[in-house]
């Protein structure tokens, strides 16, 4: 596709994001839609921009992202993880700064499975003494 393109895969909960970075003007495209169109919530938009703002490259790079699975917060987290990995491929010196902010580590928390005999993962039926 492009000669200087960097790639990163991000995951969070059940979402997976594929992030492609190349030099540009700061355009972010997620599943053929703009960041503002894709994420209505300002918090999700903020999460996506965090790694770029940390390394001050918001206006220097164009991002092309495909994301699937999960909900809004999981997808935002997956995109953030993917952007971080792509930035590290772009410039390895950014790793220490991104690691310090906690963006390099994959958030391993997932939904706990429902257990037999319980209403939810941990919610027990009401206890009756008599």
UniProtKB/Swiss-Prot annotation:
Keywords: Ribonucleoprotein, Ribosomal protein. The keyword Ribonucleoprotein applies. GO terms for cellular component: cytosolic small ribosomal subunit. It holds the Pfam family Ribosomal_S9. GO terms for biological process: translation. InterPro entries: Ribosomal_Su5_D2-typ_SF (IPR020568), Ribosomal_uS9 (IPR000754), Ribosomal_uS9_bac/plastid (IPR023035), Ribosomal_uS9_CS (IPR020574), Ribsml_uS5_D2-typ_fold_subgr (IPR014721). It comes from the Bacteria. GO terms for molecular function: RNA binding; structural constituent of ribosome. Belongs to the universal ribosomal protein uS9 family. NCBIfam families: PRK00132.1 (NF001099). PANTHER family: RIBOSOMAL PROTEIN S9, SMALL RIBOSOMAL SUBUNIT PROTEIN US9M. This is Small ribosomal subunit protein uS9. The lineage of its organism: Bacteria, Pseudomonadati, Pseudomonadota, Gammaproteobacteria, Aeromonadales.
